Amino acid sequence: MHLSEITHPNQLHGLSIRQLQQIARQIRDKHLQTVAEFGGHLGPGLGVVELTLGLYQTLDLDRDKVIWDVGHQAYPHKLITGRYSDFHTLRQKDGIAGYLKRGENKFDHFGAGHASTSISAALGMALARDMNGEKFKAVAVIGDGALTGGMALEAINHAGHLPKTNLLVVLNDNEMSISPNVGAIPRYLNKMRLSPPVQFIKDNFEEQFKHIPFVGESLSPELGRIKEGMKRLAVPKVGAVFEELGFTYMGPVDGHNLEELIATFQQAHQIAGPVLVHVATIKGKGYELAEKDQVGYHAQTPFNLTTGKAIPSNKPKPPAYAKVFSHTLVKLAEQNPKIIGITAAMATGTGLDKLQAKLPNQYIDVGIAEQHAVTLAAGLACEGMRPVAAIYSTFLQRAYDQIIHDVCIQNLPVFFCLDRAGIVGSDGPTHQGMYDIAYLRCIPNIVMMAPKDEAEMQRMVVTGIEYTTGPIAMRFPRGNGYGVPLMEEGWEPLEIGKGEILRNGDDVLIIGYGTMVYPSMQAAEILSEHGIEATVINARFVKPLDTELIVPLAQKIGRVVTLEEGCVMGGFGSAVAEALLDADVVVPVKRIGIPDVLVEHATPDESKAELGLTSRQIAERVLQAYFQKQVSAVI
């Protein structure tokens, strides 16, 4: 059987180990070829090929439900659930998603993009199953660092308290998240990897004991206590943590040995109550370059399969915002030992790996634990440090209570640096950084800013470090800057709450925030070609808003347009409209940004065009709103 013939995972039933191994090779080939051509996540999926095949051969997927954590592990799952012929559309507009979406396929039982959600979801399904009197297996596959997330531990704590609820948790332990795992839990799991299989000892000890003449049967009542003692000898001195939490622990199992995996899963299905199967895998398995560089090959842009090197673009690009951010932060940290960079398992993505390499004592990686990262930063701030929490916009959502309760209510000087703010592209709706303006703007005490380009971002990094009155946040986008000149030192902080006028005109006031400032200027030039002259403001700050600049100009010009790369509901445009109403300035305000929709996976340019956020579309929308007679000139 060839992989292309598999349209339903139950077709794996009855296949021999040799046939499954052939399917495994074909999955890796297809996975590698697709990611090499189009980009995507590489290492996580390559590491779970045998795990997926072994697990699915022991389940009835017409009935049983498998919940995958951090959906980028699930590329093999997609390939054996009817998406082989569409796999070349991975992460592309109108193609299949890079993560899991309930609406994409009947075997995607729960959406996944952020980490640590699978056990909670699977437990909820298991409880509903029991309440409804149904019969199916609920399985959570968690790994790639997700077990370090507090939500996963909360779910384990709950599930372990339900001894009659059948739940299978499969731990894909590849010793990594995106970067190497950090913390006590990964260290404990590493010790478990080196220990003999616990379940084997428990099961075989009793069988061997009973064969001792005259003694075995008579001491049978004591076997339980003896087995518990043997179990503790078989695992690290930390104790059989999962067993103590109410789970039957099995493993560690070789995650690339199909015979061992199938036998273990078959045995696990026979055990009542919550079970955890610990599977030791190699991230990037089957592609030598990915096995050697598990961080670099976690996810890739298009690359040459032979050399492993990224395919160069046709023209050189300006530096990425994240690179400029990290370079500037390192320069400042070299001069100020109180600056502490904090990441939640995203050192490479945020650029804080550069701080780690240069100043390791001024760097903290907390693992996939955004809530802890924020309150840790608050504690550092209490003692006079300058914590810089570099967290993707989409992941900071997970620490909302901590932002309010632990930082803003106490007015602590934590500097939040929100990478990947705005439209992020092929990762899709789970990763779009659309909401941070709205969800932060309503919190007292916080200052919020966004740079128009990479040079202004350097000044904002200095501003954030020097602002010690309370919390401050800077959002910046994924991708490259504009190529403007950068400075190596001597950056001046910005005045808090002050914007700047970039262009003067009497017909319309355009106020851009962050990444939409340059499109504002471009739209103004297009409008000028049609006889419409715009004043353009770079707001710089949404909180506090520069009302001294904006309100008089709005009153004078009488037509206002706001531009933002974020949700318009409660966003920057709402802040401007509220300020004008509060000042009793009643003028029309056209808010342009991301409407009340989910932005699906596509390139950022494709998404912006679909949302009407290109400079030409902006000019057209301004003309439609305020200068109707001239619309046809642009169309």
Curated annotation (Swiss-Prot):
PROSITE patterns documented for this protein: TRANSKETOLASE_1 (PS00801), TRANSKETOLASE_2 (PS00802)
- Highest taxon of the lineage: Bacteria
The EC designation for this entry is 2.2.1.7
As its record notes, the protein acts as a catalyst of: D-glyceraldehyde 3-phosphate + pyruvate + H(+) = 1-deoxy-D-xylulose 5-phosphate + CO2
Q: Which HAMAP family match?
A: DXP_synth
Q: In which pathway does it act?
A: Metabolic intermediate biosynthesis; 1-deoxy-D-xylulose 5-phosphate biosynthesis; 1-deoxy-D-xylulose 5-phosphate from D-glyceraldehyde 3-phosphate and pyruvate: step 1/1
Residues that coordinate or bind thiamine diphosphate: H72, G113, H114, A115, G145, A146, N174, Y287, E370
Some GO term, biological process aspect, for this entry: which one?
Answer: isopentenyl diphosphate biosynthetic process, methylerythritol 4-phosphate pathway
Task: Report the family membership.
Answer: Belongs to the transketolase family. DXPS subfamily.
Q: What are the required cofactors?
A: Mg(2+); thiamine diphosphate
Q: Name one GO molecular function term.
A: thiamine pyrophosphate binding
Q: What class of enzyme is it?
A: transferase
Supply the name of the protein.
1-deoxy-D-xylulose-5-phosphate synthase
Q: How is the cofactor bound?
A: Binds 1 Mg(2+) ion per subunit.
Give the UniProt entry's GO cellular component terms.
cytosol
Write down the species: Trichormus variabilis (strain ATCC 29413 / PCC 7937) (Anabaena variabilis)
Transmembrane segments in this chain: where? none
Does the keyword Manganese feature in the UniProt annotation?
A: no
Alphabetically sorted, this entry's keywords are: Isoprene biosynthesis, Magnesium, Metal-binding, Thiamine biosynthesis, Thiamine pyrophosphate, Transferase
- Note the subunit structure: Homodimer.
Give yes or no: UniProt keyword Magnesium: yes
Known function? Catalyzes the acyloin condensation reaction between C atoms 2 and 3 of pyruvate and glyceraldehyde 3-phosphate to yield 1-deoxy-D-xylulose-5-phosphate (DXP).
